[in-house]
Amino acid sequence: MRRDPAHPVVHVEYPDWLDSVVDWNLAYPTDEERMRLAIAVARMNVERATGGPFGAAIFEAPSGRLVAVGMNSVVRLNNCTLHGEMMAFMMAQARVASFTLNAPHLPVHELFTSCEPCAMCLGATLWSGVQRVVYGATREDASQLDFDEGPVFPESYHYLEERGIRIVRSVLRDEARAVLEMYRAKGGTIYNG
């Protein structure tokens, strides 16, 4: 059946390689293990040329059970909103069948992202329901590749923290930054610079 172009359908799915990187039955007990998964997703995304150098994962805390991952899919799926964090939020909420990861019947959820969130992803973090954000590379690391991370201010983080969302910075930063550098070396598209 041919679709009417005036009524497009948006279909978001993981790339084919995902299950070669992610063990959905594994628990990830430490921040370093959780961050290594987000970085591995980002790295594979670059190696397979399926998107930008950004990966994210959402876990139940404190069990470390993996709920969802996300990888930058902006170019692959022609959608400027499909950053790693946004995709992780979408997939996690679909998996738990809730518009918030903060619903009373759900355990606490945490976001691990290979790079500090941009303005869009940081804004979505507030409404996602995660209670903690842990990132690797910094916005300065991303800007060195000419990615425009948008208007993120110290007040942005203060706002999240006032609402009970803890922020942990620069976990495995060197490993995460290496993925950004690999993307540059491969001539990856800078789609928002």
Language-model segment annotations:
Residues 54-64:
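Short beta-strand scaffold segments in enzyme catalytic cores
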Residues 73-87:
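A short, polar/charged loop-to-alpha-helix boundary motif
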Residues 102-116:
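Immediate flanking context of iron-sulfur cluster ligation sites
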Residues 115, 119-122, 127:
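Conserved redox-active cysteine motifs that mediate thiol-disulfide chemistry
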Residues 83-101:
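Short, solvent-exposed cationic patches
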Residues 47-51:
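Short loop/turn motifs at secondary-structure junctions and domain boundaries
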Residues 1-45, 124, 128-193:
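Zinc-dependent deaminase
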Residues 67-68:
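A structural microfeature
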